[in-house]
Amino acid sequence: MAETPFVHLHVHSEYSLLDGAIRMEQLVKKATSLGMPALALTDHGNLFGTVEFYQEAEKAGIKPIIGCEIYVAPGSMHEKKTTNGGRDAAFHMTLLASDDEGYRNLVKLSTKAHLEGFYYKPRVDRELLAQHSSGLIALSGCLKGEVNMALSEGQQAKAIQTAATYRDLFGKENFFIELSDHGIEQQRRNRAGLIEIASDLDLGLVATNDVHFLERAHHEAHDVMICIGTGSMIHDEKRMRYVPELYFKSGEEMASMFADRPDAIANTLAIAERCHAKLEFGKSKYPDYLPPEGKTREGYLRELSEEGLRKRFGERAMTDPELRERLEYELSVLYKQGFTSYFLIVWDFINYAKSKGIPVGPGRGSAAGSLVAYTLGITDLDPLRYNLLFERFLNPDRISPPDIDVDFCQDRRGEVIEYVREKYGKMAVSQIITFGTMGAKSVIRDVGRVLGWSYGDADRIARMIPNELNITLNGIDKKGKHEAGAIDKNPELKNAVENEPATAQLWGYASILEGLSRNSGVHAAGVVIADRDLSEYIPLTLANDGSIVSQYSMSPLTDLGLLKMDFLGLKTLTVINDAVRLIHRQTPDFNISSIPMDDTASFDLLNRGESIGVFQLESGGMTATAKRFQIEHFTDIIALIALYRPGPMQFIDDYVDRKKGRKKIEYAHPLLEKICSETYGIIVYQEQVQQAASALAGYTLGQADLLRRAMGKKDVEKMAKEREVFVEGCARVNQIPAKQANAIFDFLEKFAQYGFNKSHSAAYGLISYQTAYLKANHPVEFMAGLLGNEINNTDKIATFVTECGRMGITILPPDINRSALTFLPEELPGGRAIRFGLAAIKNV
């Protein structure tokens, strides 16, 4: 039997934080299964989930209708007060974007509500609605809507006047009286009044269900979630409650409820038919870097790159054809893909930071594979010397935005962000929102509290959940994919759930709520930059500290073509900078960027396990592994950082045995020797997979990057096709038999799943080496720098003071006449010491 045609126009997802309990994929799947041609998303006061909703709906072949249940202030949105006991602090109204202008207006309204009208809730007012009403369809709202509120108070005339005001504001054809029936007495009392108003004012009626959860059976779990959000207990009598009817009903159920008003059902389809707002993906919204007068961006980038090439390589810049070819190739890709401005923008703010003495990291992620980045000073590692690939950073065969993340001194990172704000406009730059979710252990404790469990009882169950990254209760992730969950991995937990009724109840609720978004936050490093006021593109909100934050998270911003950057704060850069400043007191020309990369004392320090304070190498496990490695070259540090991770750790024993000659090094094909010799025949890096595919099967390095990605994702169907291409390529280019080619493909596939980005490992390995060098060659200054950056951490100070003792460095006590705020080197007749800093003394 065909479903009755109907479209839900008032729906809340998990982004109505701790109020809606529906995951986006499941929401769209439900609408599709019921044969609905379209679906709206109208979260409370925000557009957080818009892009995810739109993409899921498009993927499923269902029309997405972008909307929001807004809050309308009773007077001016700038007036921060309530009347009538606070009940009318803000009225609810459902807005839907009928076209692109409507979407832009919805974005503006949401932004201004958060940035200017926030008072308990993000609010707009009638004046603002009038300015941004074009392209919007408005529904009068739920029981908390202004028309409904007037009717609930017995003020029919006021209700009519309110409806007439909004009719005039939006236009008669764009304002509908919203009808719902959740079995609530007040709704039934208001129903006749709403129908009368619609008749008197010649307005359409529309049926909605104010959906908050997917199935009727989810009502109790949703009730528990409401208690989590309000800090209530399930047995509290005077708490917020939702009725069981707010689930995603079928068209048939809705038509049955509104059998007397088929027009209200038909209007859902009519409204859906009118809505065709589109989101624009992919088109760049990057700001254009303004070069000096008379110069083009492309010309200026080339000029800076040529100048940097000469500074970095001296005479070699003129005589080495490999350098010239690589530079020309990278510039041509940047020009072709339209990322000239991007590189200039990054160069500009890094150049600013360095000019102000703000320490900048040597590189991060795949950007270290770019020669242009090296010539511009964006990175500080020669990609040719360490065989780093540009295609791992920017693939000429796959146009996708580059991703240059930058580490700055933790204390002064904010100065760089402020510079970017001033340069491109305060409203063109914002931080990026994140969403905290209800994790496996936390949701057990939250639900336990709501159900009245003691902390100890709930904690008993939570502790049974294995301490594994991304563990889920039942092995079902947010996208509905199945794998082994906590209940499969711990028999004790399974027994408790199966044999303890109270635990089974808790587990049932927690399983429904697990993974839902519970709060918003601010990304620790992410910044988005646009070519104009961001609210022309995306909705904005405010962080607790008053800074502007995007309402869309990282991935949607990238999909929409906005420039996303990570400005990370790295304490180690501050330590290095402080140590170098102290070294300059005795050695003014010391330059950390010019230290030799083959310093035996640095390697010996690591091989003895004296790595306390050495970046990335100071954990017990890493220290022990470094001793086993017996580091002889900087490349050993790069490999160590790449291997010491979950997954590739399984290859460490094999790596060490081959390195020490205890195991024969073998290669699946002679061409792999050049690629894998530095890692003793083991594929450690993602770049090695690319190089192998290129050398053996004739892939371009860009095509090989796509192969590497496919291998890493374990896409069975795609891998079968790639295997054919690889085997054919091996035969064509190197006459490798199919059997051997298949074996090589299996070999590459095995390691591709664990391979690490060599560019990142090399860049962070450089910081590791620099800290080891400072500790080995300038121990007093380095330890003073470490201590000075842990002023408020007594445990760390104790660790470093003990380490100083082991190193033979005396720690002098605080002295009001000799101590500074921080830890400083001090000369003694018998050597050098460190004077304790006054700021590290408790209560000083």
Predicted region positions:
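Alpha-helical scaffold/interaction cores of sigma-54-like transcription cofactors
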Residues: 1-844
